[in-house]
Amino acid sequence: MTAIVSIHGRQVVDSRGNPTVEVDVTLEDGSFGRAAVPSGASTGVHEAVELRDGDKTRWGGKGVTKAVHAVNNEIANAIIGLEAEDQELIDQTMIKLDGTPNKGKFGANAILGVSLAVAKAAAEARGLPLYRYVGGTAAHVLPVPMMNIVNGGMHADNPIDFQEFMIAPVGASSINEAVRIGTEVFHTLKKELSAKGMNTNVGDEGGFAPSLDSASSALDFIVDSISKAGYKPGEDVFIALDAASSEFYNKDQNIYDLKGEGRKLTSAQLVDYYVELCGKYPIYSIEDGLAEDDFEGWKILTEKLGDKVQLVGDDLFVTNVKRLSDGIERGIANSLLVKFNQIGSLSETLAAVNMANDASYTAVMSHRSGETEDTTIADLAVATNCGQIKTGSLCRSERIAKYNQLMRIEEELGSVAKYAGRSVLRKAK
């Protein structure tokens, strides 16, 4: 009864006004699944291909009609009739049909849209919410949200070199309370920035994008806002950074060019800068502290901070088991950022999370800067019990949709629900 009878892809628009792929899947029993695919701004060179049309006369070349055509033709012809519950078979059928190592023929945006829509349809056929269908009876951990309240780098038009400054309400007792704490800090920060004559416009992910000249300036504002909101920095609320350092790495010169701060640093010097920041501020997590292929730099960072700070690989691992396996073997980083459009299918995403867990690496479920109202990552965060989620700030409805879904899941789980809280902190903290 879970045989796929129809697949329909279409072009819709994401939160940045760019086209993206949405897919509808219907099963023999009438069950239905719909998924919309996100898109990143700072993308790793090792990510699966996001297929764009390249026709500059339409959508600035960013149309996805080629990917949609693949969904409605080659992919549909191959998987209509297959059982939706056989996720591995469906994903592998699409991957083999594509025939490229990076999903470059159909696009990861086409394959992922179908993959997620199939899972949603199968969940409906079983009469289960998505988190329960994917995660089974063990799914019960609500993630600590890493809330992006100051944007820089590729996510904002300001001098700040680092891309994201996030707050993590680890002292909350529930996801509901964590959202409340985050919202209170967010509104306090807005008042503080406004009082200093700073811009309170928001960036792609809903964080403020003030014209600050350094990471320290942003961190000072955040720590002050946590305190003024009535919480203790380093106890109730910790801070996480996404440096997105591949974006300011000069490969030819092998230096990190922090233009906003007017500094050019070697890998070792940048690591020392992180050590300095972690000594001064309650930072528990740093994402992409070094460039995606700066393995020597990652080794230094892991040796100096790995025992007390979560070191997250985003561009480093791109949710790819081969990249992750290599990183584990090298002993670099200690956490995997999970973005399903980096790899392009649900089964491959879950395989990466399982590999991270087996190596005692943490996993952080993540959105992209170009999002939609689709809330799949909220369900997957609970399904995998990963304990942490990045889904933006406390404004912009495409971000809030995920928080609202997490609160619904928590309510549905009732007494079984467990908020990850302080368990996400490294032991040295």
Swiss-Prot record:
EC number: 4.2.1.11
Annotated (2R)-2-phosphoglycerate binding sites: 163, 339, 368-369, 390
Gene3D superfamilies with a match to the protein in the record: Enolase-like C-terminal domain, Enolase-like, N-terminal domain
Annotated active site: 205, 339
Residues given in the record as Mg(2+) binding sites: 242, 287, 314
Subunit structure: Homooctamer.
HAMAP family in the record: Enolase
Cofactor: Mg(2+)
Identification of the protein by name: Enolase
GO cellular component terms, semicolon-separated: cell surface; extracellular region; phosphopyruvate hydratase complex
Similarity-based family: Belongs to the enolase family.
Gene from which this protein is expressed: eno
Entry-linked Pfam families: Enolase_C, Enolase_N
